[in-house]
């Protein structure tokens, strides 16, 4: 397994280096500020900012794609669905607001209202759909959800999303100013799905509109991880075909959105031990961050096999490597096991990542130990 070596062992740990705030362990924490790179992320497009607070108003637009479209995204496929802004709004409202309301513990809720329609030319790419929707959106719209009436080619992505630009220092933070968007093709609205089409792709693209980046992808852009909304969002449906929502999202996204407060983040710059609470919960120490001092971070969190993550075979500890480039989060890589990374660390397991070792003991007590590399 190379630099990611998983063995069954137990190691003793020493001193604590913890962040400010309440912790779930019995030790007295030493005050330790957030890593500089993590603080910087809070001021970059990777963080939610105003996008992740309260109601987020999306206008729903339909993009009419001509049958003779030459755009590679549509793959020359002939199907065109009779979608309307109102019908799509009704379908999306049945699942998506409740998903994000639960994920954020009531801190954030997307609100969907019908917008309009835009028709592109045969030579246009999907971006023309987005440009037309933004140009036609009302002044009160924070973002647009654009759904094409055409399916995407089998070798094409299902959609895309963008957090756009920051809000202007003066004036309204409308979609005209930020250009925030979530765009999907027609596949998830196909009549074969019946009255309950899957919403995980829409939720994934809305995640992008909040500034979140992909996790667990390979060089070809394939989503390998079943742990995160921002990777294989269909992972729960792979286990239970009746599932329509995505899995939950990783603690780093909850933190960047402001849904997991800094008081519940523990930072280790040296050896540390703590009892983790589930990252999907709303209290307790829910994220251990190992500051490697080189601009990269290791995150450790407890995922419970319940709620949006009930597709997991068991509760367990997930570990990810975060890389930051040019002040923004650039990659999130799972470090436990093999794709789809659903078999998480259990009590008695140890994970070694270069000069750091993460050990799990009973009650989801986690120890991080640092050793000098010679």
Model-predicted regions and their roles:
Residues 64, 148, 232, 302, ...:
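Pocket-edge structural micro-motifs
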Residues 1-27:
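Secretory targeting and sorting signals
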Residues 29-201, 210-218, 223, 326-374:
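Propeptide-to-catalytic entry region of secreted or membrane-anchored zinc metalloproteases
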Residues 153-309:
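Extracellular hydrolytic enzyme modules, especially secreted metalloproteases
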Residues 261-373:
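Pan-zinc metallopeptidase signature
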Residues 1, 28, 151, 235, ...:
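Residue-level marker of positions within ordered structural domains that often coincide
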């Amino acid at each position: 397994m190379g630099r990611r070596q998983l063995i069954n062992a137990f190691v003793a740990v020493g001193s604590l280096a913890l962040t400010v705030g309440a912790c779930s362990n019995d030790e007295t924490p030493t005050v330790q500020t957030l890593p500089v790179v993590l603080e910087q992320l809070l001021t970059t497009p990777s963080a939610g900012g105003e996008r992740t607070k309260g109601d987020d108003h999306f206008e729903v637009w339909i993009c009419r794609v001509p049958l003779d479209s030459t755009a590679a995204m549509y793959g020359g496929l002939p199907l065109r669905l009779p979608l309307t802004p109102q019908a799509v709004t009704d379908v999306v409202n049945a699942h998506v607001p409740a998903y994000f309301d639960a994920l954020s513990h009531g801190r954030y809720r997307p609100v969907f209202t019908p917008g309009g329609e835009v028709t592109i030319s045969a030579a246009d790419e999907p971006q023309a759909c987005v440009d037309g929707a933004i140009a036609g959106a009302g002044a009160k719209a924070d973002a647009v959800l654009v759904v094409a009436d055409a399916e995407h080619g089998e070798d094409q992505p299902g959609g895309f999303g963008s957090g756009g630009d920051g809000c202007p220092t003066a004036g309204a933070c409308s979609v005209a100013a930020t250009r925030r968007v979530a765009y999907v093709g027609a596949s998830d609205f196909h009549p074969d799905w019946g009255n309950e089409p899957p919403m995980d792709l829409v939720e994934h693209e809305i995640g992008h509109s909040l500034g979140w980046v992909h996790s667990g992808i390979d060089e070809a852009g394939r989503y390998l991880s079943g742990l995160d909304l921002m990777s294989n969002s269909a992972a729960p449906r792979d286990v239970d075909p009746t599932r329509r929502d995505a899995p939950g999202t990783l603690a780093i996204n909850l933190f960047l959105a402001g849904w997991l407060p800094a008081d519940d983040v523990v930072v280790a710059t040296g050896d540390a031990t703590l009892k983790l609470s589930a990252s999907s919960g709303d209290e307790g120490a829910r994220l251990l961050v190992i500051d490697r001092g080189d601009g990269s971070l290791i995150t450790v969190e407890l995922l419970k096999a319940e709620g949006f993550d009930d597709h997991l075979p068991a509760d367990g500890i997930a570990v990810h490597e975060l890389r930051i480039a040019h002040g923004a989060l650039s990659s999130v890589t799972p470090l436990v096991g093999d794709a789809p990374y659903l078999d998480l660390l259990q009590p008695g397991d140890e994970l070694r990542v270069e000069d750091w070792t993460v050990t799990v003991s009973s009650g989801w007590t986690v120890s991080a130990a640092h050793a000098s590399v010679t």
